[in-house]
Regions:
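Short acidic-hydrophobic, aromatic-tinged amphipathic segments that line or gate anion-handling sites
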Residues: 48-54, 175
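Rossmann-fold dinucleotide-binding core
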Residues: 91-184
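Short glycine/serine/threonine-rich phosphate/pyrophosphate-binding segments
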Residues: 12-17, 71-74, 119-121
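NAD(P)-dependent Rossmann-like dehydrogenase/reductase catalytic/cofactor-binding core
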Residues: 140-141, 212-280
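An accessory alpha-helical subdomain
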Residues: 177-228, 245-249
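Rossmann-fold NAD(P) dinucleotide-binding segment
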Residues: 53-102
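NAD(P)+-binding Rossmann beta1-loop-alpha1 motif at the extreme N-terminus of oxidoreductases
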Residues: 1-48
C-alpha cells in the first residue's frame, strides 16, 4: 500500500483527487489542509485532517494540490523536510518549469495535469451528467500528461499510476517533458485559447449591445463555434465556405498581431510561469 500525502486537500483540486483515491485500496491518504473551511469540508466528507508533520513523516508520495501563487513557498518549506526516496507530485508545471522548486537529488519530482474531457469525446458519454462534466470531475473520461522532472524512473511508474488513479476515468497517460507541458499550459491553453475565447465572448456582448436579441446571438454563436472547431480540427470531411475562408483570412490581419506566436518562445513562457507563481 502506498502512503499518499495531499497538501491542500480541502481545495477544489484536493477534494477532487481525494474523492477518487479514497475508494482505491492501493492508497492510504494523509490529508493536510491549514484552512478552516477546507478542514470543515474534509471532515464533512467523513475523512480526517492531519497536521503537516504527521502527514510528511514516512510518506511515499507528497501531492502539491495548492494554488500556483503559493506553491513556491510551500515547496521551499516542505521539500527540505522530506525523507530520502520520497516522491513529490505537482499538479501543474508552472512552479517546476520556472525553477521555483528546491532540487534534492535524493527525492524524485514529477508533474501531471489532466487534459480535461475533450470537446467531442463528451458526445460519446452515455450518462447525461457525464456529458456535462466539462472540468473532469470524475464522470467523463479524460487523458492526462505526465512528466519526470528528475529522479528515479522506477518511482515514475508508481507515481504515474497514482496520477491516473487521481483523475479517473482516464483514457491515456501521455509522457512528455516539463518544458513541453509548459507549452501546453500556460502557453497554448491559458494564454492563447482562453485569450481567444475571452475575445469571442466580448464580441458576443458587443453584438447584443448593438441590439441583436441575446438568446439568438448565443445560439448562433454556439452553433458556429461547434461547426468551426469541427471543420478547422478536421473532425469530418468538409470545408469552410469560400465566404468563411475569406473572413478567416481577414481576421488574421484585423485581430491578431503578426508576432502573436511569440507566446511560445522560451523567454515568453518563462515570464508567464514566473508571473503565475508569484512574480520574480
Amino acid at each position: 500500500m502506498t502512503e499518499v500525502t495531499i497538501l491542500g486537500a480541502g481545495g477544489n483540486m484536493g477534494r477532487r483527487i481525494t474523492r477518487t483515491l479514497r475508494e482505491n485500496p492501493q492508497y492510504t491518504l494523509r490529508l493536510v489542509e491549514p484552512g478552516e473551511r477546507g478542514r470543515s469540508l474534509i471532515e464533512e466528507s467523513g475523512l480526517q485532517v492531519v497536521d503537516q508533520a504527521e502527514g510528511l513523516a514516512g510518506t511515499d508520495v507528497v501531492v502539491f494540490a495548492v494554488p500556483d501563487k503559493i506553491v513556491r513557498g510551500i515547496a521551499a518549506e516542505v521539500i527540505p523536510l522530506l525523507e530520502s526516496s520520497t516522491s513529490v507530485l505537482f499538479l501543474d508545471p508552472a512552479a517546476v518549469a520556472a525553477d521555483r522548486v528546491p532540487r534534492r537529488d535524493d527525492i524524485s519530482c514529477f508533474v501531471t495535469h489532466p487534459t480535461h474531457p475533450p470537446l467531442y469525446s463528451l458526445l460519446g458519454e452515455e450518462d447525461p451528467a457525464a456529458r456535462r462534466d466539462y472540468w473532469g470531475g470524475g464522470l467523463a473520461t479524460q487523458a492526462i500528461v505526465f512528466a519526470v522532472a528528475w529522479g528515479d524512473e522506477g518511482q515514475a511508474a508508481l507515481v504515474e499510476n497514482l496520477a491516473i488513479a487521481m483523475f479517473e476515468p482516464v483514457s491515456q497517460s501521455y509522457r512528455i517533458t516539463v518544458d513541453q507541458m509548459a507549452l501546453l499550459e500556460p502557453a497554448l491553453t491559458e494564454t492563447l485559447t482562453n485569450g481567444c475565447i475571452a475575445v469571442i465572448r466580448e464580441g458576443m456582448d458587443r453584438v447584443v449591445a448593438a441590439g441583436v436579441p441575446e438568446e439568438a446571438t448565443r445560439q448562433f454563436l454556439m452553433g458556429h463555434l461547434q461547426i468551426g472547431i469541427a471543420l478547422i480540427f478536421e473532425q469530418f470531411d468538409w470545408r469552410l465556405s469560400e465566404g468563411a475562408q475569406l473572413a478567416l483570412a481577414r481576421s488574421r490581419e484585423q485581430i491578431f498581431r503578426d508576432d502573436w506566436h511569440r507566446i511560445f518562445e522560451p523567454e515568453a513562457v518563462l515570464d508567464s510561469l514566473k508571473q503565475i507563481t508569484g512574480g520574480d
